[in-house]
Amino acid sequence: MEFIQKKTNDSAVERFLSKAAESGISLVWDRYEGQLPECGFCESGLSCRDCLQGPCVSHPFRDSNKLGVCGKDKDILASQTLLRLVIKGTVASLDQLSDFTKGVESNKIKLKNKAKTDQLLKESRNLLQNGGVAITKEFPKSMVQRWEESGIIPEGIAGDIFKASQKLEGGIAGFEENLLWAFKVSLLAGMAQKLQGSLKKAVFGNTSPAKMEVNLGILKKETPNLLLYGSLSPVLKQMIAEAAEKKKVHVAGVCTDPHLPPYHFSPVTNYVSQEIPLMSGAVDLIVAGDQFVNPSLSHLAKYYQTPIISVGVLNGERDLNKLAKDIVEQAKKSFDFRRKIPRDIPEVTESAVMGFSCEDLDLKKVVKDLSKGKIKGIAILSGSNNVKFTQDRELVTIAQEFLKNDILCISEGEASISLAKYGFLNPSKNDMELGKGLSDLLRSLGKALPSILDLGSSENGGVTDFLLNLAKADKKEPRDYPLLACFAEANRSTEVAEALWMVAMGISTYFWPSLPVSGSPKTMEALSHLCQEQFGSKLHVLTDKKMEPRIKADLMIKDLTGERGPRLSGHPWK
């Protein structure tokens, strides 16, 4: 990968890059360039450290197939590299669900719907222990039947995570079996996210679309700023919000779910620029989870005298209510202590309406416009940021091309934050260049809808609910519609697991940067043709590092409309 000439598209972030250089502060872009050139074996999935006889490598040249000490060939290495990523990503989703259920079971919060909460707690325990037999009833029978025939129906942590991890330890499983194990594990992640979203509604109430401000300009100059970083228990977040409201402490978020009725945590920035808020001098305290939080924060926080509280420490406070009150009190003390530190807050904000759900949208109108050809298809925009790309550029450019070509765009998680910064989630700016069919559809769905519809944090399974309800609207399967998922600037293993979940549901998925499987032509081929046979969809892994985002968008649009072959639905749309 070459040096990134332009680091970010975000003007609020860009103004701090020269400040960092002048101060000798190393940011994520500097550290990335310090790692170049990247290891080609690791990048293509052909390295292994699974035992102490290595590390071993293979190579992708012609028909040659260098074996590891234990006999792993390049196909096994690449497929196991993908499996390893999916296991990591799935464990992250299961950990979130486990933390949430423990918080709810502590009986420290008032439940909106106790009967529904009790039912979902039971289903969550069942998923964690026995697999997703109960929750599969919510999916189309034909989809579940394909999962059963492929052998990927979840059987719980012991049945899936433990056994899948042993595929990395040894055995004679071939690369196709490794890939099916990766899909089996990814189903656990998708179902955990769906359950977490349902449980959150039962505990806190339904999330309705909320207007909020995004970007660095939301930081306060004369008020303590407490920032929540990464995935945190919704129970703890609610307690922090309640305590902060009483003490007049401003709470905002970075890489965290912004919706928690009745509270909202306005996003300050997104993943790749998570260090930048500290450079404003206006962050008085950070509460950090583990997922989506970079270790570099701790070094930069010392420079700006900002305390960080990690909620994942081994001997941490178990009483969440007490912990929340202590956090807010420490934020106030830190604000007083840091008064002499200059606050350089850029006046850059953008309004956004976020948090739509299926209840807010008439999906029958969407299906009707699809059938009449008024819109060409639906694109699911996912993923976060990756330092290998100019921040936000790939996603924003692809979104622009989709909108111009009458493709309905829905977004989730960090992708929504990226898009919100540039006005795509602002209803007052829905006069952006839209195709006529899409413009008419959005007007028919409701007053003052933004150009792109955010379905909330990926940890809540909003996209899954959308797909299932879309299928019910016309008694079809998701794969019967012209649909695609796009991870334009993917980063974390959770996104890899989610991409496989999308494919297992029948949604052809495009993933950038290239997954570490390119060293094995057989694995690359299987992600296309094996997935098409098993699920009616493909995982597109493109290896051209210099492909411009408009070219990527054009490729996806042609696949969606059938210009490069059969439409993504697998047959002509009727």
Model-derived segments and spans:
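Anaerobic metallocofactor- and corrinoid-dependent redox/one-carbon enzyme cores
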Residues: 2-574
